[in-house]
């Protein structure tokens, strides 16, 4: 019996195969991978630390309200999702016209990571984008100061929250300590924040501005799509 020196009795070394990543079409066609709305909501609740099945409600948004969260229905682009920086359910329409709801849990430069049935699938944005017409749903947590519009001339804790959150985002404080008055300097900062997030720069802290500000409120429990540098946080 012949053999290479020093190899007698050595166990065979197996090289593991690189796992094959299924295409988006294969994922959508797989009956074992649910793409219904409830499954997407269940995955989204998990990202926020909640068990979807433990709550009652006709819709996912009704269940979200029970834990103090709100639904945000919007139509936008990948850039909008990056700015929002929250996991989001996107609606895809396949070539047969069937609608699928999938949870996006991460965005990098060229790829989106989808969470389906507990498995993560990283797919090119260009592939997902062919079936995505911009519709998405995200959850957000309103600030403790409430959801009422905040505007120039107002005073109170809600104004201080706006100042603190803008400072956390990276805009310089205009008063020290933080003033309770919403003055013209703060209005200018709100407009700058709105422009950077492609919002109407009216200086009014309404729903959409509150939603985006909440992404920088410092809550450790809120899930994010990407790291601060990837999200464009200054």
Regions found by a protein language model. Name each.
Residues 29-33, 45, 85-93, 111-172, ...:
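Noncatalytic regulatory segments and standalone regulatory/sensor domains
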Residues 36, 77, 108, 124-126, ...:
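Helix N-cap and loop-to-helix transition residues
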Residues 100-107:
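Short beta-strand-centered aromatic/proline hotspots
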Residues 2-92:
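Cysteine-nucleophile protease catalytic domains, especially the papain-like/related folds used
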Residues 150-159, 164-216, 222-225, 232-233:
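Short acidic, glycine/serine/threonine-rich helix-capping segments at coil-helix boundaries
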Residues 43-54, 78-84, 91-95, 110, ...:
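Structured segments of extracytoplasmic/periplasmic soluble domains
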């Amino acid at each position: 019996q012949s053999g290479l020196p020093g190899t007698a009795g050595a166990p065979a070394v197996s090289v593991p195969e690189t796992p094959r990543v299924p295409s988006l079409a294969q994922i959508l066609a797989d009956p074992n991978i649910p793409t219904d709305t409830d499954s997407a909501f269940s995955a989204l609740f998990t990202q926020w630390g909640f068990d979807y099945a433990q709550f009652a409600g006709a819709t996912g948004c009704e269940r979200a309200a029970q834990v103090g969260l709100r639904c945000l229905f919007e139509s936008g682009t990948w850039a909008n999702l990056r700015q929002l920086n929250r996991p989001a359910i996107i609606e895809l329409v396949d070539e047969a016209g069937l609608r699928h709801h999938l949870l996006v849990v991460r965005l990098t430069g060229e790829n989106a990571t989808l969470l389906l049935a507990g498995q993560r699938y990283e797919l090119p944005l260009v592939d997902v984008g062919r079936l995505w017409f911009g519709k998405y749903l995200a959850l957000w947590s309103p600030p403790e100061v409430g959801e009422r519009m905040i505007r120039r001339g107002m005073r109170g804790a809600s104004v201080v929250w706006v100042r603190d959150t803008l400072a956390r985002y990276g805009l310089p404080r205009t008063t020290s300590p933080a003033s309770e008055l919403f003055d013209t300097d703060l209005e200018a900062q709100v407009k700058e924040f709105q422009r950077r997030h492609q919002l109407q720069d009216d200086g009014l802290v309404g729903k959409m501005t509150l939603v985006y500000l909440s992404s920088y409120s410092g809550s450790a429990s809120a899930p994010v799509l990407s790291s601060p540098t990837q999200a464009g946080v200054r």
